[in-house]
UniProtKB/Swiss-Prot annotation:
Span of the annotated motif DDXXD motif: 371-375
Record: residues binding Mg(2+) 2: 371, 375
Gene designation per UniProt: TPS13PK
Annotated binding of (2E)-geranyl diphosphate, by residue: 334, 371, 375, 515, 518
Region (Disordered): 50-69
Quaternary organization: Monomer.
Tagged with keyword Magnesium: yes
Transit peptide: 1-95
EC number: 4.2.3.228
Catalyses which reaction(s): (2E)-geranyl diphosphate = (Z)-beta-ocimene + diphosphate
Pathway(s) where this gene product acts: Secondary metabolite biosynthesis; terpenoid biosynthesis
Stated name of the protein: (Z)-beta-ocimene synthase TPS13PK, chloroplastic
Keyword Magnesium: yes
Cysteine-cysteine disulfides: none
Length: 640
């Protein structure tokens, strides 16, 4: 297992100084299993055999159309247009402004009192309640002061305090070292954690998910031990509750720590969708004994007001979808406008990203339809024509397409060329459109490659699959669009300058998380209807292992990819010696700004949210429906 951990990251490590995909291909040579080289000859023989056996069926496949039998959308146009919210009322807006000023005074007072632990705890609560975006300047001022003065660092043997500092500083891009835990270790270097210190163990567990690639230290080893203790704590509490129920005694006390621990063991805080986490935490925080009523009221009101903005966004994107006629003319494709919008809330929930959410919902809708054309409906000959049309980006390229493809191509063509000129303004506009068109061409070419694999009955090696799959998952298309929406394209040309050479590593890493989580949640259903083998099946076939073992290796790969994402925004090699002017690397960068980096992280988090229990995008499972209801439809009841 240790050897596996040391080699797994090579599969997803790209050279940031050279975006040539050949480097990526070579880096994948070190695979997840030691069986790879032993099975290599067998693998190639099996592949050829499979190709030979399926060649006779190619013509039949090429002329037939598959059907995924997707369910109709749960959320209809008329229902969405009927949504209304009382929280648009100016009285609520004024009340929120008043509460914000009260909280701002609270934060400033905490800064002046010079109690670092209290400051960190306040920041943590503000973040988890979903209202920290109102106080970014004040929070950054506190964290900068704590980092430059090592305030909590000197707290002797306080695992909780040091873990909280480590997590919050790294979350905000500060290159804090694991040496912060030196006061919490014994002479052998082991953490001195009391098994009864649930708060400390939970804080340590959550902090361990902010490690970066190749970072030495005891924190990751401690994660498994801490997880074991936390699991034992959960069992103990459950047994205690069951014992009381057996005695017909329902008067057991609410356990705040139990709620946090069980939640963290399901999925760590660092990997959770921010807005959904806030909705959950508001309910949990309300039951806390030391709950602050001002913070709670602000969180509830702010959530409901922002939800009313989401409902306006929904009306807009549902109207756009109706205007394209794709839902009516392309009945084979998934009509998932609501879920497509839910993705955008996960990537950027703040109200001022309203235009972004509307744009990316349209991108998501187009991706979903085009994906179904390649995966389900189109013949190989038709897919070749469509790919060529997108590459040419010429309206005359529509002439050779079948009618259903013309509908989709025209919607895509008009969308890209009609992007708001307040975004693509100046002379850069034309170049940006060219880059966005290229990202769509890259996506279609990756789809076509997978279609060829399917029609030829070919099972790719794991490295061959991954080399193509991080693009075919559509992450680069989504992140390319949002990049030019959140930065000034006339000033920040980092992505544009490399658009014909590759993508920044953070786009690749975020897309990798999206790909692997998608495969974990959808591969079984996709294979049933007929699709190319996904990462799980490629590992099973290549290494001769069970599906369960392959899934465990993919989970490990996801964890290693998160370390690469962490490294993209936490610069542990930063030689800045601190001082009053120190800021995290993404504040100083002239290349990629903070908002874009956070959105890349959030796309990975959304992948965990949508695919945690299966295919939450395509199948419309209960969890996704509950997410829609709690985030977009139902306001939080206010305490009278």
């Amino acid at each position: 297992m240790a050897a596996l951990v040391s080699t797994v990251s090579s599969i997803i490590r790209w050279n940031s100084n050279n975006n040539n995909n050949n480097n990526f291909t070579r880096s994948v040579k070190s695979c997840l299993s030691s069986n790879y080289h032993n099975n290599n000859n067998i693998i190639h023989n099996k592949t050829v055999l499979m190709s030979t056996n399926n060649n006779n069926n190619n013509n039949q496949k090429n002329s037939s159309r598959r059907s995924a039998n997707y369910q109709p959308p749960l959320w209809q146009f008329d229902y969405v247009q009927s949504l209304s919210s009382p929280f648009k009322d100016e009285a609520y807006v004024k009340r929120v402004e008043k509460l914000k000023e009260e909280v701002r005074v609270m934060v400033k007072r905490a800064r002046e009192e010079e109690k670092p632990l209290s400051q960190l705890e306040l920041i943590d609560v503000l973040q988890r309640l979903g209202i920290s975006y109102h106080f970014e300047d004040e929070i950054n001022d506190i964290l900068k002061h704590i980092y430059n003065n090592n305030n909590v660092y000197n707290t002797n043997n306080n695992v909780y305090a040091n873990s909280l500092e480590f997590r919050l500083l790294r979350q905000h891009g500060y290159p804090v070292s694991q040496e912060i835990f030196s006061t919490c270790k014994d002479e052998r270097g082991n953490f001195m954690v009391c098994t009864n210190d649930i708060k400390g163990m939970l804080s340590l567990y959550e902090a361990s998910f902010y490690l970066v690639e190749n970072e030495d230290g005891i924190l990751e080893e401690t994660r498994e031990k801490t997880k074991k203790y936390l699991e034992e704590y959960i069992i103990m509490i459950m047994e205690k509750q069951q014992s009381l129920l057996d005695q017909n005694n329902n008067n057991y006390d609410y356990d705040y720590d139990y709620e946090l621990v069980s939640h963290a063991l399901e999925l760590p805080l660092h990997w959770r969708m921010l807005r959904l986490e806030s909705r959950w935490f508001i309910d949990v925080y309300e039951k806390r004994l030391d709950m602050n009523p001002t913070l709670l009221t602000l969180a509830k009101l702010d959530f409901n007001i922002v939800q009313s903005i989401y409902q306006d966004d929904l009306k807009h994107v549902f109207s756009w979808w109706e205007s394209t006629d794709m839902g009516k003319k392309l009945e084979f494709a998934r009509d998932r406008t609501m879920v497509n919008f839910l993705w955008t809330v996960g990537v950027a929930f703040e109200p001022h990203f309203k235009s972004f959410r509307r744009m990316i919902t349209k991108v998501n809708a187009l991706i979903t339809v085009i994906d179904d054309i390649y995966d389900v409906y189109g013949t190989l000959d038709e897919l070749e024509l469509f790919t060529n049309a997108v590459e040419r980006w010429d309206i005359s390229a529509m002439d050779g397409l079948p009618e259903y493809m013309k509908t989709c191509f025209l919607a895509l063509y008009n969308f890209i060329n009609d992007l708001p000129f307040d975004v693509l303004k100046g002379e850069e506009g034309l170049h940006i459109i060219k880059f966005l068109q290229k990202s769509w061409a890259d996506l279609c070419k990756s789809y076509l490659r997978e279609a060829r694999w399917y029609y030829n009955g070919y099972t790719p090696s794991f490295e061959e699959y991954i080399e193509n799959a991080w693009i075919s998952i559509s992450g680069p298309v989504i992140l390319s669009h949002l990049y030019f929406f959140v930065v000034n394209p006339n000033k920040e040309n980092a992505l544009l300058s490399t658009c014909f050479d590759g993508y920044p590593t953070i786009i690749r890493h975020s897309s990798m998380i999206l790909r692997l989580k998608d495969d974990m949640g959808t591969s079984t259903d996709e294979l049933k209807r007929g699709d190319v083998p996904k990462s799980i099946q490629c590992k099973m076939y290549e290494d001769g292992i069970s599906e369960e073992e392959a899934r465990q290796r993919i989970k490990l790969l996801i964890s290693e990819t998160w370390k690469l994402i962490n490294k993209d925004y936490i610069n542990l090699d930063d030689d800045d010696d601190g001082g009053d002017d120190y800021s995290p690397m993404f504040y100083k960068s002239n290349n990629i700004n903070k908002a874009f980096i956070e959105m890349c992280l959030n796309l990975g988090r959304m992948a965990h949210c949508i695919y945690q229990y299966g295919d939450g995008h395509g199948i419309q499972d209960r969890q996704t429906k509950d997410h829609v209801l709690s985030l977009l439809i139902h306001p939080i009841p206010l305490t009278q």
